[in-house]
Amino acid sequence: MQYHDQFDVIVVGGGHAGTEAATAAARMGMKTLLLTHNIETLGHMSCNPAIGGIGKGHLVKEVDAMGGIMAQAIDHAGIQFRILNSSKGPAVRATRAQADRLLYKQTIRHTLENYPNLQLFQQACDDLILEGDRVCGVVTQAGIRILSKTVVLTAGTFLNGLIHIGMEHYRGGRSGDPASVTLAERMREMPLRVGRLKTGTPPRIDARSVDFSQLQMQLGDDPVPVFSYLGKPEQHPRQVPCFITHTNVQTHDVIRANLDRSPMYAGVIEGIGPRYCPSIEDKIMRFADKDAHQIFIEPEGLTTHELYPNGISTSLPFDVQVQIVRSMKGFANAHIARPGYAIEYDFFDPRDLKPNMENKCLQNLFFAGQINGTTGYEEAAAQGMLAGINAALRAQDKDPWAPRRDQAYIGVLMDDLSTLGTKEPYRMFTSRAEYRLLLREDNADLRLTPVGRELGLVNDERWAFFNHKLEMMAQEQQRLQDTWIQPQHPATEGLNKILKTPLSRPASLEDLLRRPEVNYQDLMAIEGVGPGIEHPQASEQIEIQVKYAGYIDRQQDEIDKQLRHEETLLPLDLDYSEVPGLSKEVCIKLNDTKPQTIGQASRISGVTPAAISILLVHLKKRGLLRKSA
């Protein structure tokens, strides 16, 4: 049965990757179809009810800078906002928000249902339509064939999903949703490298059964931050506290006594779990010297009693889960509303992807999200947007786009995945970015909004807002440079109160702001100096640019040197075993990965600088030295 319409882009899956992929393609004017097995679960938070965090918040800001929907959704659904690492340098500061799970899902669905160029269709995808090595559509569970110029696959944990609670297991994409078995088996017949990963989630607790007087309260920040560059605090719903408790010796004894009933330790689960979000069983075994682990008690929403105990993800049997929960302070009489579980699922080796997220073997097919071996809503959203952008470009026969490592965390993410691959669920951290001083949360718009506008992702409202901010910053930066304070100036008395050493010679406001003990707000509060600009994001960027100018310039110099050969293209049909001088090990790794650029090749483990020099000489001799567009 043929569907009555054809599309430029079909997105399979309505999670965090799928929704960003679909909206990105639609913003670029593409006729887009979002295919989901259940419209009711669009934007559903399968695990923790939160957005952001170290490295993750940076990704959300980058998606927002290019017009994505995640940041604006959490601004309308966030019930607690905090800036993490607020006392540290600007490179590692990150926004994190607790979400009302239901409100977030409702916001995403409302956004999608009212998005121009985007249609929703509730059908599971069972197959891809192929013409040779080219994908040209999908086949649904009901046998409906839908044609499209490109397909973006964002199936999350649904491909051959297997849920484990103790020794019991059953098929599922997540709790309450069916696994995608037919599509998974069909994908295994294609020329794709497939592996298994696992992730898990903790039991949910009924708040009415918890003694909060025994817990430590954790409040959000005041003033309340926003996530989107267009966000306003008044968009936030009512703010609520989180709480903290700890595991203890009794908890750990219960877990150790029941490890033989853990599917992970009994060898039932084959997939590798996330290193940086381990199960409570893993924590107890890996950190055997610790008598306690901190557990964050997070509300699931304003209209539910469910709590999310962040830190006790487990696949132990239900009776053991009850013992674990009730051993913690404040939880002696706790009622578990939903048991925790682990889920195994298929993923595809991301080294089989080009940097633009298109599969190397199958044209017009793009992968995004957990099927690429990542973990986390934010990593999925970033990949989804990039895949949606490039599916739209491919549908228009335009050149692909992928950010470099020095341009965006999205670039770091995709370069790591497509070059190095992953054997465990990949999570973003600021430590993964060598140029993190330039890739801050505060300047994601400066880095990516102009690119987004050029690609057709940024609408007039966002573009006008961005340019107004640039104007304000330019005018204020000029004022700071041109305004000088003399030692005898009336403002000096107030100024000396915040300076470590009194002002003894003329200084510009920019010079004063460069001092570590002076911040922009304090400087503007001095009579005769202010009022300055009230836009908090603009003033923050001005202060960072002034204080860190030397470090930023030095890092930019490093980037300029690195870029000399970073984008030199490598022929995809190059047989590295025929390049004289390369070791057998290097040849195997290069032939296995097929890097697209010298930059990618240089980041493959075992490929030495000497090997890169040999490659460059080989390319030059054969007249193959050329840069990517």
Swiss-Prot record:
GO cellular component: cytosol
Any GO BP: tRNA methylation
Pfam families: GIDA, GIDA_C_1st, SAM_GIDA_C
Stored PROSITE patterns: GIDA_1, GIDA_2
Cofactor(s) demanded: FAD
InterPro entries: FAD/NAD-bd_sf, GIDA_C_N, MnmG, MnmG-rel, MnmG-rel_CS, MnmG_C, MnmG_C_subdom, MnmG_C_subdom_sf
GO molecular function, one term: flavin adenine dinucleotide binding
Subcellular location: Cytoplasm
Residues reported in the UniProt entry to bind FAD: G13, G14, G15, H16, A17, G18
Keywords: Cytoplasm, FAD, Flavoprotein, NAD, tRNA processing
Parts of the chain that traverse the membrane: none
Quaternary structure note: Homodimer. Heterotetramer of two MnmE and two MnmG subunits.
Sequence similarity: Belongs to the MnmG family.
Job of this protein: NAD-binding protein involved in the addition of a carboxymethylaminomethyl (cmnm) group at the wobble position (U34) of certain tRNAs, forming tRNA-cmnm(5)s(2)U34.
Protein's name according to its UniProt entry: tRNA uridine 5-carboxymethylaminomethyl modification enzyme MnmG
Organism encoding this protein: Tolumonas auensis (strain DSM 9187 / NBRC 110442 / TA 4)
Gene this protein is translated from: mnmG
